[in-house]
Amino acid sequence: MKPLSLLIEILIILGVTIKTIKAEEHNKRQKERNVTTQVSVNEIKQYLSHILEQRTSSNVINKRENLLEKKKNQRKIRIKGIQNKDILKRNKNHLQKQAEKNFTDEGDQLFKMGIKVLQQSKSQKQKEEAYLLFAKAADMGNLKAMEKMADALLFGNFGVQNITAAIQLYESLAKEGSCKAQNALGFLSSYGIGMEYDQAKALIYYTFGSAGGNMMSQMILGYRYLSGINVLQNCEVALSYYKKVADYIADTFEKSEGVPVEKVRLTERPENLSSNSEILDWDIYQYYKFLAERGDVQIQVSLGQLHLIGRKGLDQDYYKALHYFLKAAKAGSANAMAFIGKMYLEGNAAVPQNNATAFKYFSMAASKGNAIGLHGLGLLYFHGKGVPLNYAEALKYFQKAAEKGWPDAQFQLGFMYYSGSGIWKDYKLAFKYFYLASQSGQPLAIYYLAKMYATGTGVVRSCRTAVELYKGVCELGHWAEKFLTAYFAYKDGDIDSSLVQYALLAEMGYEVAQSNSAFILESKKANILEKEKMYPMALLLWNRAAIQGNAFARVKIGDYHYYGYGTKKDYQTAATHYSIAANKYHNAQAMFNLAYMYEHGLGITKDIHLARRLYDMAAQTSPDAHIPVLFAVMKLETTHLLRDILFFNFTTRWNWLKLDNTIGPHWDLFVIGLIVPGLILLLRNHHG
């Protein structure tokens, strides 16, 4: 495995060396941007041979020194002229084991240092330093470091994306039993990225990955069995896979509050991603900071919350969060007081864990009727932190906070009734409060609802409902952080890196990632797949997103069949998908497309009246459809009128007047050309 880790070191060196050359080809506004670098096999071999020669000569010298040392020890370990071979052998084994232990310990230390640097990194340069530490640890045989390096090469985490090198490293790791490597190889096989497209092989890799405890593999298999992707659809099997992951996620949420991740849809604002509402624009953030420093209490609390959990693309920063909360609390904000209490209750880098201080701030907020403060006091009494354990007091505060609509308090009430903590068990009330909290996205409430549906506790058992709920919990795992890195990679123009990350999330069953992957593939800007494979793969992903309820994806499937993208032209199938999007999701674009097909009899029986009705429905559904519908209806009415005038009782006698023959099959475009100038003149006269 050492040659592979050496290869990684070489890639890093080459990536840093030629970074500036490649950066000039990118957008001038992006400074010091890392780019994907492909290193030729010959260059790699040359560097490898050079380093290996140095190491070989070094090994020869070491062997000679060891031999001399061995002879010296042999002379010492003699009893009355007879060599004690047993003592020598034991000594040799001990020294060898000690050397191996020291070597392993050093690799572990380097890996831990790399993790620490990576967690604290604020710039690309610092991240590269972390991966250099991982490379050194990998060279010492640290499997976790090798996994990190393989991921970095696959996703382009430190500026160099080399899928071929990543695959080589994953294959070596898989032989060592790495379930993470097996999951990665399954993913690459399922898309045909750098490997042969092979769904059967992908399924085998995922199965081995899942057996080894890899939660991504378990999620992927859960989604496949839920949807029947290359396996027989089986809800119970899907339930077993999703439950394993959901149990882990719920356990982490019980210990500490998770950080929600914004899932930006590339399909919504492809022309102006920087203004996407899911990510806070830097200029807007600076403006908010200005307002906060000027004393805007509401903005102070909002910025404090964003920094407390790291939302809208901002880094989690406890010091900044505390700074804004203290300012707002000084101005009398009950929310700010409650959040300060929460920080002291949990403890973090900015404040030490202190139950007494938490109680103080929660009490201040609760005295103002604040739901977060009331819930905080309930938690202190429920767990007996800083106050005597008192379930009755906890119940009282949770009820007050729940009445004000605080979802965490609603969950706590549900949990008390579910577990019988200080009160009689009541599954109906537990279900009621879990359901209320779940409507606000409270993750633990969703988890316990899934548990109740899976076991039939307090409700009629429903495997499908349980799986859907467990799936929602699983999608809150730390792997969802790739949504942000994928988005920023796309925004920076690193399409291949973005696609690989979205594609992995899509494989795990995230609908947003499926849509985003299909959107990128459709643009044909990626280089990691052959161009002829992009439309078929995009169609597959649009279909998976549509099955999960995405109306835009359903319209896209109709478009692909209408135009023959990635499949044969099929007007009938296109009309079917447009009809589903129009009737089930009330999608204006689908209504418009379906109306056009009825107007021209494409794949369905021609029906002018139904076409007119669908055009009207599209206009009523979406204001954006008003102008297109206006032109479409004017064209429809005009052509219909012209046909009545020109062809009524004159078809045989005046055959030469047929518009299809005189102007051509696209004569309706000619008619539109006549209508538009007339409409413009009418509008001018009207305003004049």
Swiss-Prot record:
Query: Which protein are we looking at?
Result: Protein sel-1 homolog 2
Sel1-like repeat copies, ranges = 107-142, 143-178, 179-214, 215-250, 297-333, 334-370, 371-406, 407-442, 443-478, 551-586, 588-623
The organism's superkingdom is given as Eukaryota
Q: Where in the cell is it found?
A: Membrane; Cell projection, Cilium; Nucleus speckle
| Protein family | Belongs to the sel-1 family.
* Source organism per UniProt: Homo sapiens (Human)
Q: Which residues are glycosylated?
A: 34
Q: Which PANTHER family match?
A: PROTEIN SEL-1 HOMOLOG 2, SEL-1-LIKE PROTEIN
Keyword terms of this UniProt record? Cell projection, Glycoprotein, Membrane, Nucleus, Repeat, Signal, Transmembrane, Transmembrane helix
Which region is the signal sequence?
1-23
Q: What is the lineage of its organism?
A: Eukaryota, Metazoa, Chordata, Craniata, Vertebrata
User: How is the protein disposed in the membrane?
Assistant: Single-pass type I membrane protein
Q: Which GO terms describe its cellular component?
A: cilium; endoplasmic reticulum membrane; nuclear speck
